[in-house]
């Protein structure tokens, strides 16, 4: 039966939500009521599939905790007052922690003046952020296009590469197996997960995939494309595959890809949406090999966990294809003052507080602990790997991975799997995680694995 619109119902719902936003605490009955509401509304109006996913990785087999507020830079509190150490980091957005006071203050100050731009007058923060990124990024990267997400930043990179290379007769893109670049039509064409791709076939033509980390496969693909007249416009890849399971390429791989791109006249697009902003111990993961891309994609942590923002940064030579008509690729909300304020504050915090060095130090500490656990539990853990504060624990099968996430939830530590590799659990905490919290995470992982071994033995 068709449902008639109801202004009265919408007004009541919005008023109820506004009242909730104003609250700082909930009593027991309010907490129970909110939990029921959230579960019902997810089921009826968001997507019931999310409930089933949470049920599979949450202690007790229920639908999981309902988020309430940040407990500290590195913790979250649910509606029942339970505090969790965040080792998921919102899939990599909380590099400077939850509600970092510097970032929040910058956004609040800008909000008091002008939250969104007029579109007609020049907005100063967009200019200042573009200048800051030009100074921060490697090589000749100079001009920035701002958007709202990583997927959008990849879309902009693909369009920019097309606009630059089309007059040169180059239309093919090479991506890698296991890659994740987003789920919009263009980004999905570069992504390499059949589950995400098949329902939307056919995708954009001209995309080929080669094994990640295999430089000879990359050379062969570039050669074959040249022989058949399908010359390559760009190679797009992640320095470390995040959703693929935190897969690190062999040393020197990025350098070798850069040389191949130069040899064949292809642009190099690096997707640092997840690896950028200090996550791996460098501001950008490509800096571990001193590689300079033609186009760089950023998002996630760029907004400091406070505002969504993405950026596509390119060299002047490439970006100049948009000079004559800057309206060829635009977005209403991209580069808005609130998002730019958050990004500028985030960069300031990362540099001022030396969080890159902390990411390296604490990442080494955590990874050493996880590798020790892998040696102690070879029947459960296949490998622990990572760089900086981007780590993964790969289990012997998918079910054990789910069980580990559930057991960690019992220990009040949030973790989750990677989108392209279900048996791999990512460890991606804020770079602000304390040494004491690192020790607690390793202790929780040991307890979780011990409980899982008992369950396996009793089965």
From Swiss-Prot:
It is an enzyme of class 2 (transferase). Its EC number is 2.6.1.82, 2.6.1.29. Catalyzes the aminotransferase reaction from putrescine to 2-oxoglutarate, leading to glutamate and 4-aminobutanal, which spontaneously cyclizes to form 1-pyrroline. This is the first step in one of two pathways for putrescine degradation, where putrescine is converted into 4-aminobutanoate (gamma-aminobutyrate or GABA) via 4-aminobutanal. Also functions as a cadaverine transaminase in a a L-lysine degradation pathway to succinate that proceeds via cadaverine, glutarate and L-2-hydroxyglutarate. Keywords: Aminotransferase, Pyridoxal phosphate, Transferase. Belongs to the class-III pyridoxal-phosphate-dependent aminotransferase family. Putrescine aminotransferase subfamily. Its cofactor is pyridoxal 5'-phosphate. The keyword Ribosomal protein does not apply. CDD domains: OAT_like. This is Putrescine aminotransferase. Pyridoxal 5'-phosphate binds at residues 150-151, 274, 332. It comes from the Bacteria. Pfam families: Aminotran_3. One of its GO terms (molecular function) is diamine transaminase activity. The keyword Isomerase does not apply. It catalyses: an alkane-alpha,omega-diamine + 2-oxoglutarate = an omega-aminoaldehyde + L-glutamate; putrescine + 2-oxoglutarate = 1-pyrroline + L-glutamate + H2O; cadaverine + 2-oxoglutarate = 5-aminopentanal + L-glutamate.
């Amino acid at each position: 039966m068709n449902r008639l619109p109801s202004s009265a119902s919408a007004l009541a719902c919005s008023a109820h939500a506004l009242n909730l936003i104003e609250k700082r605490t909930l009593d027991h009955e309010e907490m129970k009521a909110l939990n029921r509401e959230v579960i019902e509304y997810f089921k009826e109006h968001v997507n019931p599939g999310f409930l089933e996913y949470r049920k599979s990785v949450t202690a007790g087999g229920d639908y999981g905790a309902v988020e309430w507020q940040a407990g500290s830079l590195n913790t979250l509190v649910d509606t029942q007052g339970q505090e969790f150490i965040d080792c998921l980091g919102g899939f990599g957005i909380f590099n400077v922690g939850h509600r970092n006071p510097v970032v929040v203050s910058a956004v609040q100050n800008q909000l008091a003046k002008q939250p969104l731009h007029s579109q007609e007058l020049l907005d100063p923060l967009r200019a200042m952020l573009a200048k800051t990124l030009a100074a921060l990024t490697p090589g000749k990267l100079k001009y920035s296009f701002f958007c709202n997400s990583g997927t959008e930043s990849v879309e902009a990179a693909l369009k920019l590469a097309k606009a630059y290379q089309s007059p040169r007769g180059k239309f093919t893109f090479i991506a890698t197996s296991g890659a994740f670049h987003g789920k919009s039509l263009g980004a999905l064409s570069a992504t390499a997960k059949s589950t995400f791709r098949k329902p939307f076939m056919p995708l954009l033509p001209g995309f080929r995939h080669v094994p990640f980390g295999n430089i000879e496969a990359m050379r062969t693909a570039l050669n074959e494309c040249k022989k058949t007249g399908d010359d390559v416009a760009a190679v797009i890849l992640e320095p470390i595959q995040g959703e693929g399971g935190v897969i690190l390429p062999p040393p020197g791989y990025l350098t070798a890809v850069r040389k191949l791109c130069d040899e064949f006249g292809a642009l190099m697009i690096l997707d640092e949406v997840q690896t950028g902003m200090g996550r791996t111990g460098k501001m950008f993961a490509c800096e571990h090999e001193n590689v300079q891309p033609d186009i760089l994609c950023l998002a996630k942590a760029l907004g400091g966990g406070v505002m969504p923002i993405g950026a596509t940064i390119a060299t002047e030579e490439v970006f100049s294809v948009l000079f004559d008509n800057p309206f060829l690729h635009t977005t209403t909300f991209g580069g808005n003052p609130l998002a730019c304020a958050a990004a500028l504050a985030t960069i300031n915090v990362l540099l001022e507080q030396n969080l890159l060095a902390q990411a390296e130090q604490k990442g080494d500490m955590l990874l050493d602990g996880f590798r020790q656990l892998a040696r102690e539990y070879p029947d459960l853990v296949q490998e622990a790997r990572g760089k900086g504060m981007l780590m993964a624990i790969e289990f012997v099968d998918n079910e054990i991975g789910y069980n580990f996430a559930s057991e960690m939830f019992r220990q009040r530590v949030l973790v989750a799997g990677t989108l392209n590799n279900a048996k791999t659990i990512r460890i991606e905490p804020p770079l602000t995680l304390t040494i004491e919290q690192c020790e607690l995470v390793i202790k929780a992982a040991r307890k979780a694995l011990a409980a899982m071994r008992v369950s396996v033995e009793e089965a």
